Amino acid sequence: MNTKFPITAKGFEKLEHELKHLKHVERKKISEDIAEAREHGDLSENAEYEAAREKQAFIEGRIKELEDMTARAEIIDIGKLSGDNIKFGATVTLIDDDTEEEVTYIIVGEYEADITRKRVSIASPIAKALIGKSVGDFVEVTTPKGSKSYEVVTVEYKELEL
C-alpha cells in the first residue's frame, strides 16, 4: 500500500521512537532469549524457544509495519496551520445541542487517534462531519450510537503533546 496518510509531527516522532526501540532494544533482547532457549536442548519440545520465536515474528512484523508507515507518512506541522475552517490538526470545541455540554476534540491521523485524550481520527464520523465547518456552524454527526447535533464554538491550531 503506497497511499500517503496525514500524521502530526508528534505522532510521527512516536512512530519513529517505537521503530528505533524495536530495532535496537527488542531485536537484541529476543536474539538473546532465543540463544538462551536453544541451550536448553531439544528444540522440538522447547516451549521457551517457541515463545521466543513467536515474539520475534511479532516484533519483525511490527518493524515492517512501522517502516511502511513512516515511509508513507505525510507529516503536518499543526503549529504552522491556521484559519477559521476545520481541517486536519484542528482543536475543535463543540456544544452538544441536546445536553448543552461542551466537548473538545483534536483531529489527528488514523494511527494517533486516542479517544481517552480526545484525539479523533480524520477518518472518524465526527471528523468527517466537522471538516470544512467553522465557528457558528451546526453539524449533524451519525455514529453507531445514533445521531447527535453540535455547534462549533472554537477552532484552534496548536502543537500537540506526546
From Swiss-Prot:
Keyword Transcription found: yes
Source organism per UniProt: Rickettsia felis (strain ATCC VR-1525 / URRWXCal2)
Keywords noted in UniProt: Coiled coil, DNA-binding, Transcription, Transcription regulation
Superkingdom of this protein's organism: Bacteria
Coiled coil start-end: 45-74
Function: Necessary for efficient RNA polymerase transcription elongation past template-encoded arresting sites. The arresting sites in DNA have the property of trapping a certain fraction of elongating RNA polymerases that pass through, resulting in locked ternary complexes. Cleavage of the nascent transcript by cleavage factors such as GreA or GreB allows the resumption of elongation from the new 3'terminus. GreA releases sequences of 2 to 3 nucleotides.
Annotated InterPro entries: GreA/GreB_C_sf, TF_GreA/GreB_CS, Tscrpt_elong_fac_GreA, Tscrpt_elong_fac_GreA/B, Tscrpt_elong_fac_GreA/B_C, Tscrpt_elong_fac_GreA/B_fam, Tscrpt_elong_fac_GreA/B_N, Tscrpt_elong_fac_GreA/B_N_sf
Record-stated family: Belongs to the GreA/GreB family.
The keyword Ribosomal protein appears for this protein: no
Protein name: Transcription elongation factor GreA
Pfam family name, one: GreA_GreB_N
Molecular-function annotations in GO: DNA binding; RNA polymerase binding
GO biological process: DNA-templated transcription elongation; regulation of DNA-templated transcription elongation
